[in-house]
Swiss-Prot record:
Official protein name in the record: DNA polymerase II large subunit
EC numbers: 2.7.7.7, 3.1.11.1
Organism: Nanoarchaeum equitans (strain Kin4-M)
Gene: polC
NCBIfam families named in the record: polC (TIGR00354), PRK04023.1 (NF003103)
InterPro entries reported in the protein's UniProt record: PolC_DP2 (IPR004475), PolC_DP2_cat_dom (IPR056172), PolC_DP2_central_dom (IPR056171), PolC_DP2_N (IPR016033)
GO biological process: DNA catabolic process; DNA-templated DNA replication
Keyword Ribonucleoprotein on entry: no
Length: 1243
């Protein structure tokens, strides 16, 4: 059976069961509320129908498909034509032109965001027609924070869409006043400095230009409590608070993406009457002038260095050419927002940091990088699989996964030994003996990440995958040997002819030679073989035996030769005395291994032979003779060596730690089991049982009426007779009149509220909302909770009633609809917790995976994998063994297993929090729910984690509104959600540290309801599965994944282009590097062939939990952060200490000090807050104690650590004095600094 047929069949089963359950009436609606979208058009239409309910989903989806045939997929013109249809009333025949504009703009925005994010619903809050100064109508757009989810381009294009609708509707252009322009300037500046850093902050001149020329008003709702410092109370600006949505649209939208929009306008703007947007051309000139001016004022950019090197090019013709090697500029932006406890692994381009290497492994690419697993343990465990790092290039953020075929880290031990750490076992064994990490090892970055960033490549180090291709080219020129290179085939499958001839020519046995050719990472030549190959084929020396010559100066090279001449050679090893400190220092810089033996150090046989060979048997005279002619140490070595020596250092990349890896069950505040309100009666634990003991709950409930029992209830299905009930309404106007009347009687509003809640007032309740001017679905009720609990227990036939069943304080949805109490009881029994929409979710860091070995997975057998469709490995061999490499199917996922933590309730107890355990509990809950509440057969019947294999789950990323179908195929001890890059892209996310959530399929279909979603912006539609995608289309996922390279080999020309700093987009065309984007026409994405350049022994081999998570206090985290800085040579601990104090501790202390003077006060008993302490000193509401909300401890928590760092490390005098002054100020406020009278007089 075809892969997607299997998924469709499983999903169909789930829908059938869910529909039977929902039809019974226990849920807010009788239908499953997660519609299945068959294509992107349906997804978009389903999303917009959440606001425009009359929209015909099928008709709209068909229209989108027709327009795509005319203009192309995701073309902005499709959005413009959708606006035409909306304005003509062809989609919904609204009488109001504003409603037509609203429909058209939201639909167009939904289309270009692929119907995945909630930005068209929650980010674009409202459109209004307002009056210009001359009284003519113009269009105003109101944005809010969720517009961020659309991305900068879509946010900017939404303004273009709105202007197109404005012009078509005959509205006039916006006429900003001078005051409004100034307000935009100061508000964007305030947002950037006080709320959140903008990716791009336009200058005042840019803002003024844009506001004057954009034909619609970009407005917004307030998203922050902070007010603008000036230009308040403007007539057409409704708020004095900062409008985050507006700031994002102007700064990160139009200003940042102007070039992209202008390109489209010049292409087809006139055709659609948008030629007036050509003002963006003038804006781009202005932007360029301003940026050039700023660069000049700051002394200009530091240019990356260029070095001219003569290297042999093995192209059609083998010849030596001079190439200008272009190095990048150090970029220290990643250090600007450092957090205490999250270490810096290397400073910008610092020698010994991570060496940049091009390639992709099983679990890298799509913004994820690979490092050697030993590095994770040598860095005290701060790095774990899935840990985020922020760095210089190619992307701002990445997460790390293990790749064993990379260059390992190099360490200096306490006895002076310098060695490579080849394995995790070795790293753990020597961990306590390490004095310094000289080199962190490679970081593997996929070519696709450079392509996506539209970046220029940086020089690659000379590595095995480069060397072997030069070997191939030279061998074919020198002998009757042929190898068929193919970027889309692993070297193991390359067709080779004439191997016997080559074997005879080189004097290397045929079998050994084939191993070297086919397995360049694991079968490296010996030093003798390497020298023979280089001499006979004329290729550079193998990188395994090449020191990092560019790390030292020419003077140091001369010193090296002089010192080595003093050393002795014994048993083919160089021995030197420990007193030769200069020699040792140079060897450390060159990353040459040397080992302690008594008073001596020795260099192993291979490197001894290599050094003597490269340095022409330590020919000092020749070295001195060529000294002035050589440009650097590497050039000088090449003048001594009989064979060519290449640069194995390349470029180092600076990184710091970002967010730690994550894998845990989603829990709302209070960890409720059900969405049932228990008010104050539930106590601090919000416990239904505690409320039961009190006999009632006072909260707001939606009301229903049972015609059979002639009684009111809070459920759609009567808990007494089981019949469906009718919605009833409460007249707000009558309730207000009753309150006024009761107040005259009681003279106390508290008693009035109590009286109103204690009765359902017959005159206020109506069965039709047409009978009242202000109908509402809910009322404040003093509910007989005992009745509902007893009925729930009776229905479920529970004999052991749980002591803790947690509800919520109060419901937050529009009509205060509650979840059935039965569900809360069943979740409590199963030990699972509900999310705001009725589902149960498991959150995790998004980790990409394209290939795996069965042995990497827990809980799945070879037979089970075959059953799931994994029949052959990547080489075409039938699946028989656990070490075979398989290509992951696009919607299969791997979940965390075996995560152990201390219990919250009992610190001596260890509990599991992994997804395997979590979903076992969820499956048990769903089965109990089916059996006890819905009277249906259980579906999952899970006894052990292995039983979850093959089960359907839904994935949904934060801030999105569309879920994606996934299938569990196994578990690993990695803390993250491991899935195909296309699956992650289907949620409009990459894998740079983002997270996703996973829900068990049947739990979501049965228990999700839009009716439960909170009635506030960002919660009504965001992070909710409003629509479900079964089959992902490559063209309909985030286009970043289209740039992911899928080749097994980068061609030789690629490495030469990296030296030149060529643009990645040009290299793709020139070198024929295939990416997923080359397969956009492939309908079945499971058939796309995907390769990898670097194998790894196991995706599980590495640290699983970051030290950052294991350490409990900030002081501990900071101490270890500095301890690691002292251990890594590429980091200066003094700089780290200074950055931590300046960027984290001092701003935090100052902020809390400001907050202390403007704090509110809280009641310890009922949590009511007050702006000022009540005169009685007690809570007027309940008599509880009043306490601070900003405590002295909060202000001083980082002060001791800051002072300790300031004294221990060499930091700037200004920073140190600022800190000491802050310390004195705090002591003056809270005490601790005693002054004598003399001190006071002299102060």
């Amino acid at each position: 059976m075809v892969y997607y047929d299997i998924l469709a069949k499983e999903l169909e089963k789930l829908y059938e069961i869910a529909e039977k359950a929902r039809a019974q009436g226990y849920d807010p609606k009788d239908i499953v509320e997660i519609p299945l979208a068959n294509n992107m058009g349906e997804r978009v239409a389903h999303l917009i129908s959440a606001i425009h309910e009359q929209l015909d989903v099928k008709k709209t989806a068909e229209l989108i498909l027709e327009l795509e045939k005319q203009y192309g997929f995701l073309d902005w013109r499709v959005g413009l034509k959708l606006i035409d249809y909306a304005l003509e009333g062809k989609l919904i025949p609204y009488d109001d032109i504003l409603k037509r504009i609203d429909l058209g703009v939201r639909l167009a925005l939904g289309y270009i965001t692929m119907g995945v994010v909630s930005a068209p619903l929650e980010g674009l809050v409202e459109l209004r027609i307002k009056k210009r100064k001359d009284g003519k109508p113009y269009l105003a757009l109101y944005y809010a924070g969720p517009i961020r989810g659309a991305g900068g381009t879509a946010a900017a294009v939404s303004v273009l869409f709105a202007d197109y609708a404005r012009k078509k509707a005959g509205l006039y252009e916006y006429d900003p006043t001078k005051e409004e322009i100034e307000r935009y300037k100061i508000e964007i500046d305030s947002y950037h400095n006080k709320v959140a850093r903008l990716q791009y902050k336009p200058s005042d001149e840019e803002i003024e230009f844009l506001v004057k020329h954009i034909p619609v008003e970009i407005n917004g709702d307030p998203t922050s409590d902070k007010e603008v410092p000036s230009y308040k109370n403007l007539e057409r600006v409704e708020t004095n608070r900062i409008r985050g949505g507006m700031c994002l649209v102007i700064a990160e939208g139009i200003a940042q993406k102007a070039k992209k929009i202008y390109g489209k306008i010049t292409e087809w703007g006139k055709e659609f009457g948008l030629e007036h947007w050509e003002f963006l051309g003038e804006y781009l000139k202005l932007q360029k002038e301003i940026q050039a001016k700023l660069a000049a004022e700051s002394g200009g950019e530091i240019e990356g260095k260029e070095i001219k090197r003569k290297i042999t090019l093995f192209l059609d013709e083998i010849k030596k050419e001079e190439i200008t090697v272009k190095y990048p500029t150090p970029a220290g932006k990643y250090l600007q927002e450092i957090t205490a406890g999250r270490p810096i692994f290397s400073l910008p381009m610092a020698i010994g940091g991570f060496r940049l290497r091009y390639g992709r492994s099983f679990a890298t690419g799509f913004a994820t990088s690979g490092i050697h697993p030993a590095t994770m343990f040598l860095t005290y465990g701060f790095l774990a699989i899935g840990t985020q790092m922020r760095g210089e290039r190619p992307k701002k953020s990445t997460i790390v996964t293990p790749v064993t075929s990379l260059h390992p880290p190099i360490v200096k031990l306490k006895d002076g030994t310098v060695k490579k750490v080849h394995s995790v076992v070795e790293a753990i064994k020597i961990a306590n003996d390490v004095e310094e990490i000289l080199f962190l090892g490679d970081i593997l970055t996929a070519f696709g990440d450079w392509l996506n960033e539209k970046a220029n490549l940086v020089p690659s180090p000379y590595v095995e995958e480069w060397w072997i291709q030069e070997f191939d080219r030279a061998a074919m020129k020198k002998t009757d040997y042929k190898i068929e290179f193919d970027v889309m085939k692993p070297r193991k499958l390359f067709k080779i002819e004439g191997l016997e001839n080559l074997s005879q020519y080189l004097g290397i046995p045929k079998d050994r030679l084939e191993e070297i050719i086919r397995k360049p990472f694991s079968r490296k030549p010996t030093i003798d073989e390497a020298i023979t190959i280089s001499e006979k084929l004329g290729i550079p020396l193998h990188p395994e035996y090449t020191p990092f010559w560019v790390h030292i100066t020419k003077e140091e090279l001369i010193k090296l030769i002089e010192e080595l001449r003093k050393a002795k050679i014994q048993n083919n090893k160089i021995y030197f005395h420990e007193s030769q400190k200069e020699l040792k220092a140079i060897l450390e810089k060159l990353f040459i291994e040397h080992f302690r033996e008594g008073e001596y150090f020795y260099i192993n046989e291979s490197m001894t032979k290599s050094l003597l060979y490269q340095l022409d048997n330590l020919n000092l005279e020749k070295a001195k003779k060529e000294f002035d002619n050589a440009i650097d140490a590497l050039d000088l070595v090449n003048r001594l060596s009989p064979i060519e020596i290449r640069d194995v250092a390349g470029v180092y990349v600076g990184f710091r730690a970002g967010r730690p890896e994550k894998a845990k069950m989603r829990e709302m505040t209070g960890r409720p089991h059900g969405l049932f309100p228990v008010g104050e009666e539930g106590g601090k634990m919000r416990n239904v049982i505690e409320a039961y003991n009190k006999g009632y709950v006072k909260a707001e409930f939606a009301l229903y009426y049972c015609n059979h029992c002639k009684r009111y209830t809070i459920y759609r299905k009567c808990e007494v007779c089981g019949n469906k009930t009718k919605e009833v309404y409460v007249c707000k106007e009558i309730i207000n009149r009753l309150k006024t009347s009761l107040f005259k009687q009681y003279k106390d509003w508290k008693k009035v509220e109590e009286e109103i809640a204690s009765h359902l007032w017959a005159e206020a309740v109506t069965h039709s909302k047409n009978n009242c001017r202000e109908p509402k679905r809910y009322s404040l009720i003093k509910l007989n909770i005992k009745h509902y609990v007893d009925r729930a227990v009776q229905k479920l036939k529970l004999f052991n009633i749980p002591k803790l069943v947690k509800g919520v304080r109060g419901t937050s949805n529009k009509d205060h609809i509650v979840e059935r109490l039965e569900k809360a009881f069943l979740r409590s029994v199963s030990d699972v917790y509900v999310n705001k929409d009725g589902t149960i979710r498991y959150d995790g860091t998004q980790i990409p995976l394209t290939h795996f070995r069965p042995k990497d997975l827990i809980g799945v057998t070879i037979e089970k994998l075959k059953e799931l469709g994994y029949t052959h490995d990547i080489y075409g061999n039938p699946l028989e063994r656990e070490d075979q490499i398989l290509q992951l199917k696009p919607q299969d996922i791997i979940l965390p297993y075996g995560i152990l933590v201390k219990s919250r309730l009992n610190k001596n107890k260890i509990v599991r929090t992994d997804a395997a355990e979590a979903f076992k509990k969820v499956a048990n809950f769903v089965d109990e729910e089916l059996k006890r509440l819905y009277n249906l057969e259980p579906y999952y019947n899970i006894e052990k984690a292995e039983d979850l294999i093959g089960k359907i789950v839904f994935g949904i990323a934060p801030h999105t509104s569309a879920a994606v179908v996934g299938r569990i195929i196994g578990f690993t001890p990695i803390q993250g959600i491991i899935a195909h890059p296309i699956w992650h892209a289907g949620q409009r996310r990459n894998c740079d540290g983002d997270e996703t959530a996973v829900m068990l399929g049947l739990d979501a279909l049965i228990n999700f309801s839009r009716e439960y979603l909170p009635d506030k912006r960002g919660a009504r539609t965001m992070d909710a599965p409003l629509v479900l995608t079964l089959k992902l289309e490559l063209k309909a996922v985030d286009d970043e994944v289209h740039d992911m390279d899928i080749v097994y080999n980068y061609p030789l020309e690629f490495y030469y282009e990296t030296l030149k700093g060529s643009p990645a987009k040009d290299v793709k065309k020139q070198c024929g590097i295939l990416t997923l984007g080359d397969f956009l026409k492939e309908e079945d994405i499971s058939k796309i062939p995907i390769g990898f350049t670097h194998p790894t022994k196991s995706i599980r081999l590495g640290n699983k939990v970051s030290l950052y998570k294991r350490l409990k206090t900030m002081q501990q985290k900071t101490e270890w952060q500095l301890k690691l800085a002292e251990r890594i040579r590429a980091v200066d601990e003094n700089i780290v200490a200074e950055i931590v104090i300046e960027k984290h501790f001092m701003p935090d202390i100052k902020g809390n000090l400001r907050g202390f003077s403007s704090q509110v006060f809280r009641c310890t008993k009922c949590d009511t807050t007050y702006d000022r302490v009540p005169l009685s000193g007690k809570c007027p509401k309940c008599g509880g104690n009043i306490v601070f909300t900003v405590h002295e401890g909060t202000i001083k928590k980082y002060l001791p650590t800051s002072l300790y760092l300031a004294r221990k490390y060499k930091i700037k005098k200004f920073t140190k004095q600022s800190l000491f002054l802050l310390d004195r100020r705090i002591k003056q406020i809270f005490g601790g600094e005693k002054k004598s009278l003399a001190d006071f007089i002299n102060s």
